[in-house]
Amino acid sequence: MADILTQLQTCLDQLATQFYATIGYLSTYHDNSPAIPHPDVPDAAPALAKIPKNSTAPPVPAGAPVPAQSQASPPAQNPAHGAAGAGTSVGEGGQTPGPAAGAGADPNLPAPDSPRTFASRQRELARDLIIKEQQIEYLISVLPGIDSSEAEQEKRIRELEGELRRVEEERELKMRELKRLRRTLENVLRAVETGLYGDRELLERYS
């Protein structure tokens, strides 16, 4: 299991991702016109454009120029449709009418959610942000020494250093004791082997 600082960093990264996802959803699926920056505030954040469908690009200001790859020429007109519309392209007074008022929105942009769905998802996103923020607060509260002053923490560090030295000295004593016991055990085993089989040289001489 990761330590507290690693968990805290992970939660902060997740919170930033949730903020980004929340802003992206609110900017894309609302049914209102984008907010206009106040003219008297030069550093106001610009309005975000809606995110096209199946796009992984981050939100951009609504007034930003369209990228070069998306500035394609208008689609070729259907010959049959063009021929049919040729007779009606000129209105009274020789003026060409503008685009039809009933023309739909950009098909690449997702349709806005219904007010009920939008409000429900707003609450869900807000709840997720609150839960993640509470997790971060809990991890901060359990950090060691969070309620101690700098002097108290330095004193505690010195105490731990002294305790570590004592433990290291005990470990060295145990290691020396272990080596002594191992030599004693080897001598006992050698004596037992000699007592059972006698002197090997004598056995080999008279065998």
Curated annotation (Swiss-Prot):
Stretches of the chain forming a coiled coil according to its record: 146-196
Biased segments, Low complexity type: 65-80, 97-108
* Composition skew (Gly residues), residue ranges: 84-96
Q: Which InterPro entries match?
A: Med7/Med21-like, Mediator_Med21
Q: Does the keyword DNA damage apply?
A: no
Gene Ontology process terms (BP): regulation of transcription by RNA polymerase II
List the residue ranges of the region (Disordered).
37-121
GO molecular-function annotation terms? transcription coregulator activity
The answer on whether this UniProt entry bears the keyword Coiled coil reads yes
Q: Where in the cell is it found?
A: Nucleus
Pfam families, per database record: Med21
- Keywords from the named record: Activator, Coiled coil, Nucleus, Transcription, Transcription regulation
Disulfide-linked positions: none
The similarity comment for this entry is: Belongs to the Mediator complex subunit 21 family.
| Function, in words | Component of the Mediator complex, a coactivator involved in the regulated transcription of nearly all RNA polymerase II-dependent genes. Mediator functions as a bridge to convey information from gene-specific regulatory proteins to the basal RNA polymerase II transcription machinery. Mediator is recruited to promoters by direct interactions with regulatory proteins and serves as a scaffold for the assembly of a functional preinitiation complex with RNA polymerase II and the general transcription factors.
Subunit notes for this chain? Component of the Mediator complex.
Protein name as it appears in the record: Mediator of RNA polymerase II transcription subunit 21
The organism encoding this protein is: Neosartorya fischeri (strain ATCC 1020 / DSM 3700 / CBS 544.65 / FGSC A1164 / JCM 1740 / NRRL 181 / WB 181)
What taxonomic classification does the UniProt entry list for its organism?
Answer: Eukaryota, Fungi, Dikarya, Ascomycota, Pezizomycotina
Query: Which gene name does the record give?
Result: srb7
